[in-house]
Amino acid sequence: MSTNFFFAFESSEMILITLLFLGLFGRSNLVVSSSCILLCLKYFKLDQLVFPVLESRGLELGLVLLMLHILSPVATEKLTIKDLHSVTSLKGLFALAAGTLATKLNGDGLALMNARPEIIFGLTVGTVLGILFLRGTPCGPVMAAAVTAVFLQIASLFS
């Protein structure tokens, strides 16, 4: 066995293994699952086939799955046309405004991730830290990137 065990891996594999352990440490099943799947795809040499699709359409597929989850109460009739009146309540109006603002901010976060992919590792580590120390729930890198974009815009005001 080589004395330089870690040099047997490519740098991308080392990053994925690091993320895997951070996910285990932070009890983030999403990070663990994603890291394992990507490592398996690389191991079985499917990366050339699958990674381009994931890079170009993966976020879209993930958002479709998220929307299916969010809209499933409509399909199962747990929410009906009668529930539409709730949008006019104070809570409903706040939710409407928050959804609109969050969509704008998420767009900024997505643009930031596309322009600066090097922030993704920091977003992932920050997510794990939030789970561990703030008892947070991982909501995905797009929202974390949106907050990062806001922080960067605020910082640019002072520079």
From Swiss-Prot:
<keyword id="KW-0472">Membrane</keyword>
<keyword id="KW-1003">Cell membrane</keyword>
<feature type="transmembrane region" description="Helical">
    <location>
        <begin position="61"/>
        <end position="81"/>
    </location>
</feature>
<keyword id="KW-0812">Transmembrane</keyword>
<protein>
    <recommendedName>
        <fullName>UPF0756 membrane protein PTH_1668</fullName>
    </recommendedName>
</protein>
<feature type="transmembrane region" description="Helical">
    <location>
        <begin position="138"/>
        <end position="158"/>
    </location>
</feature>
<dbReference type="GO" id="GO:0005886">
    <property type="term" value="C:plasma membrane"/>
</dbReference>
<comment type="similarity">
    <text>Belongs to the UPF0756 family.</text>
</comment>
<feature type="transmembrane region" description="Helical">
    <location>
        <begin position="117"/>
        <end position="137"/>
    </location>
</feature>
<dbReference type="Pfam" id="PF04284">
    <property type="entry name" value="DUF441"/>
</dbReference>
<keyword id="KW-1133">Transmembrane helix</keyword>
<feature type="transmembrane region" description="Helical">
    <location>
        <begin position="15"/>
        <end position="37"/>
    </location>
</feature>
<dbReference type="InterPro" id="IPR007382">
    <property type="entry name" value="UPF0756_TM"/>
</dbReference>
